[in-house]
Every structure is written in C-alpha cells, then in structure tokens.
C-alpha cells in the first residue's frame, strides 16, 4: 500500500497570518563555475544565500527545496554569468508563483588571479574576495558586483615627519664640516644612521561595488581589480624577489596617500568608465600607528543611486 507523505507547506495555513519580506537559506556551500571577462571559466567554492518574499499572509511557508535545487542545477549544469543569474532569479519566482514576487541571491567566493611581480617577472596567485548579488523585485532587476582589493598605503604626514628627522640627523652629522664629499653623503645615506626614521604604512583594502547592466555577460572581475591596482599604484604582491621589494618601497614613497587620496583616485577612475550604472566604494586603511582604521566612502552620486 502506497502512503503519501504530508506536505505541510502546501496543505496547511499559517497559525498567525502575515506577509514576510524574505524567507530562504543562507550559507549554502557549492562549487560554482564562474565566467569572468578575459579569463577562462573556473570553479570557485561559493557560499550562497537564496531568498524569496512570502506575500501570501495565510501560506504556511515557501518551498526551500525548490530554491536549493535550482542553485544545484546551476552548479552542476551551467556557468554563472549575468544571464544565468537573471534566469536563476526568474526560476525562484516562477517556482513560487502564488507565494512570491521578489527574489534575491548572493554568491560569496574568493577569485584567484595570477599576478606578476613588479620587476623580476615572477608570478603568484592572489585571492580577491568577490560578492555577486542579484535582486528581482516585481520585475525590477538589480545585479551588483563587489570586490575587495588589497594595497599598501603610506601616510603623507608620517613621511614628512620622517624626512624632518633625517634632515636633523644629516645636520647633526655634518654641521661641523665646511666641505662635503659626495661619496661621504652617499655612504652615510646607506646606513641606519642616515635613514633614522621611516613613515608608517599599512595593508589597506578598497571595497568596490558596481551596479551592472545587460550589456555585460561575463563579470568584469579582472577589469575592476586592474582598475583599482593601476589607480592606487601599490598593490599587495604575490611572488617577491629583492628587486621587487625595492620597487615596492619606491612606489610607496612616490604614492603617499591618506584614505581621502585613495578614495578620490578611485572615484576619478570609476567616473572615466561608462560600463557601470553606479558605483559605491569604501577605503579602509588598517592603521599601523592607530588602534582604529581610517575610512573614506564615496559614490557615483547619481539621482536615486547608491547612498554613502
């Protein structure tokens, strides 16, 4: 004798009536094949959040397994790009026709890129945290890409103070000499006595969020990373030889920046490209001098766009 299994979500009503903004699952772990412009398709280990709204005040609940199976189908049979993300959101809603008219999904993963060293030509892997978010609200679509890009920042104020101490050390060393030989100054500058102080610097992170449109299919992950690193000039390195470390020191010295400077550089660069409908960025200088971070936030500044 065949026994049918009870389906509580379909055949019972809510004990207390009410609509719900979002119902679903968070932190689903799945391998996902990602398409990034200019890169070969590659598998990433993603943490996924999937939700729909519950507009039927009397319905017991949504069908979470339907959301899960749609994501699993993407994982096993498709590639994550702009169009497949839109199709996934459509599937969330069509699988809950009487219950939902809104859907959202978020994929969080590290995207690894091969990055060349500054001088030696050596290469190494760097991992960039990426968040892809899709939201479909009564036919209105929003697709967002967020990337964290690490770099080094050296404090302009600290650099000025260090230069002052070096000047004083130079004066103390050579004040009594009426004539100076170039070799004496050259040799002195190569000692720890000559470089008596160095400015403080720290690893920093630029969080860049852009709003994408249908003109993009493969996600511009590498393009955004390149834009940030080329604008700020001091990217955190992977493989490093001594000549690379020396060049890194030079770049830091030639690109002194407060968090405000970094934010304005990226704001200018992002304003030069028209492929993003909107952008939001946050600069985080993880201070080595202070026990707090220095932060700057800015947006494209369009009407009804991102807010700081």
Swiss-Prot record:
GO biological process: tetrahydrofolate biosynthetic process
Pathway: Cofactor biosynthesis; 7,8-dihydroneopterin triphosphate biosynthesis; 7,8-dihydroneopterin triphosphate from GTP: step 1/1
Pfam families to which the protein is assigned, alphabetical: GCHY-1 (PF02649)
Organism domain of life: Bacteria
Gene Ontology MF term list: GTP cyclohydrolase I activity
Known catalytic reactions: GTP + H2O = 7,8-dihydroneopterin 3'-triphosphate + formate + H(+)
Site (May be catalytically important): 155
The protein's enzyme class: hydrolase
EC number: 3.5.4.16
Key words, A-Z: Hydrolase
Functional summary from the UniProt entry: Converts GTP to 7,8-dihydroneopterin triphosphate.
Family: Belongs to the GTP cyclohydrolase IV family.
Protein name: GTP cyclohydrolase FolE2
